[in-house]
Amino acid sequence: MLLPKYKTYTVQDIYDLPEGTRAELIDGTMYMMAPPSRAHQEIVGEIFAVIRDYIKQKGGVCRPYVAPFAVFLNEDDHIYVEPDVSVICDPSKLNDKGCA
């Protein structure tokens, strides 16, 4: 029996997925993501609001973002994650696709 050849995926493979399909990429392995439930979205919304309000109250310069919002770690083409909530404190790292 032949085993399928292991493929190392890149960020471009994520971009080539059909519209609305979500996945994350860890060390070249693609992990498909199920659509979030309503309860999940409510919890994420509450977490986002608490973080946003705290930053505003403290006069911080950081900004919170909710998924889908890509975070590129170490400029590695084999890592692409979409955390439920991200806090970005360096606006120079933001681009049209997320945070690099």
PLM region spans:
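Gly/Pro/Ser/Thr-rich low-complexity, intrinsically disordered segments predominantly at protein N-termini
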Residues: 1-100
